[in-house]
UniProtKB/Swiss-Prot annotation:
GO terms for molecular function: dGTPase activity. InterPro entries: dGTPase, dGTPase-like, dNTPase_2, HD/PDEase_dom, HD_domain, PHydrolase_assoc_dom. It comes from Corynebacterium diphtheriae (strain ATCC 700971 / NCTC 13129 / Biotype gravis). CDD domains: HDc (cd00077). It comes from the Bacteria. Belongs to the dGTPase family. Type 2 subfamily. Transmembrane segments: none annotated. GO terms for biological process: dGTP catabolic process. HAMAP family: dGTPase_type2. It holds the Pfam family HD_assoc. Keywords: Hydrolase. Residues 66-216 form the HD domain. SUPFAM superfamilies: HD-domain/PDEase-like (SSF109604). This is Deoxyguanosinetriphosphate triphosphohydrolase-like protein.
Length: 423
């Protein structure tokens, strides 16, 4: 078991004791259990219930949203963390936070906001996660109205940071993937105190691969139920070869490795049973058996491979690495390819994405025109504190990113109606 230190438990703002207890009571929870509770009770996490995973949150009778996906990632991350001797609450908290920075419409919304935000430092869902946890989520403020967000511990913010680097490097080069906006560099510097490199801590690594497992396994399950995904492709060698080519281009690896992964999956009785899904009670039981066994297959393999690669047996923060065996990575990549590409290649899905981006641009123009008064009340203080046009633009981006999809659509409709009225 890794020994976390007082530095790992430190928070950016020293909080006073809670004054409202009826009787004296010593809180037995550790700092990471408190971090987990803060994330679990946050508005930012609840808003994920109305944000797109692969298909929209209102599609189907059993919708999988960013929130349900995050709960699944948290459970898987807790399992990997427990197997490696990490703090289970810390790993679960990292899973809960991993998508908390996603804007309306998921990656499609992220692309639209990145285009809009070019003059104020860009937009990246992972960087927005750090910004929410350390500033935007209303929990802790000082006497000067400086917000510390949820005021999580150093280790918790580190565990939530998949890419612990700013957008711009010291030499001026720009990272495509980053976990911190340049303007928030002082926060990342505090989080990474004592860790000079830009590699993710082991808890964040566990969270990251848990995301891949949940994404691939559970989204395949959704696709099968909706009729968008058919596992029969694993036995159609012509279509499989084409799918492997697409998957390698989109997610990495080689087509040959993905075809080999299909060979391994075909050998599993649970895959054959799920391929015959017909919507019956037995069909759903077989499908749930597939998801359960695949998750266990991948979690167990990762734990054993990680242990084998670390003779000391100690994991935590910068000690140890999460190791993903090649076969596991290939199987997960193939399943992710099946889950995503069949949906993404649907013409109606692409048309829907075009409309989503149009709404985001419309809401942005509406907030720019309306200024302070058009913003949600919580964001007006940051607007007043802004010292440049770029900082005011960042406030607008923060406001849009915080919206649920339903809310964004209502604001877009109001904007369209106002434009029509104004002629």
């Amino acid at each position: 078991m890794f020994s976390y230190s007082s530095s790992d438990w430190q928070r950016r703002f020293d909080e006073p004791e809670k004054p409202s207890r009826i009787i004296a009571h010593h809180d037995e929870r550790g700092p990471f259990a408190k971090d987990r509770a803060r994330v679990l009770h946050s508005a930012a996490l609840r808003r994920l219930a109305d944000k797109t995973q692969v298909v929209g949150p209102r599609d189907g009778d059993n919708p999988r949203t960013r929130l349900t996906h995050s709960l699944e990632v948290a459970q898987i991350a807790r399992g990997i963390g427990t197997g490696l001797g990490l703090d289970a609450d810390l790993c679960e908290m990292a899973g809960l936070t991993h998508d908390i920075g996603h804007p309306p419409y998921g990656h499609n919304g992220e692309k639209a906001l990145a285009e809009i935000a070019q003059d104020c430092g860009g937009f990246e869902g992972n960087a927005q996660t750090l910004r929410i946890l350390s500033k935007l989520e209303p929990k802790i403020v000082d006497d000067h109205d400086q917000s510390y967000g949820l005021n999580l511990t150093r280790a918790a913010l580190d565990a939530a940071c998949k890419y612990p680097r700013t957008k711009t490097n010291p030499d001026g080069s720009v990272n495509k993937k980053y976990g911190c906006y340049d303007e928030d560099a002082h926060i990342l510097q505090w989080v990474r105190q004592g860790h000079e490199d830009t590699s993710a801590c082991v808890e964040a690594q566990a969270m990251d691969f848990s995301d891949d497992i949940a994404y691939s396994v559970h989204d395949v399950e959704d696709g099968i139920v909706s009729g968008r995904v058919h596992l029969g492709v694993l036995w159609d060698f012509v279509e499989l070869a084409e799918l492997a080519e697409k998957g390698a281009r989109a997610f990495g690896g080689t087509p040959e490795a993905l075809v080999d992964a299909a060979d391994h999956l075909r050998e599993l009785p649970i895959i054959s049973a799920a391929a015959d899904f017909d919507g019956s009670l037995r069909g759903y039981v077989d499908l749930k058996a597939m998801t359960s066994q695949l998750v266990g297959r991948y979690v167990g393999a990762v734990i054993e491979a990680s242990r084998a690669a670390n003779p000391t047996g100690v994991f935590g923060r910068s000690t140890g690495q999460v190791v993903v065996p090649d076969q596991v990575l290939a199987e997960v990549t193939l399943l992710k390819t099946i889950a995503v590409l069949y949906v993404m290649d649907d013409p109606t899905h692409r048309q829907r994405q075009d409309r989503q981006r149009e709404r985001i641009y419309r809401v942005y123009d509406y907030l720019v025109a309306g200024g302070r008064g058009a913003l949600d009340p919580m964001f007006r203080l940051w607007w007043e504190q802004a010292e440049s046009e770029a900082q005011r633009q960042r406030v607008i981006i923060d406001n849009i990113s915080s919206m649920t999809e339903s809310r964004l659509e209502r604001v877009a409709k109001q904007s369209a109606e106002l434009s029509s009225f104004m002629g």
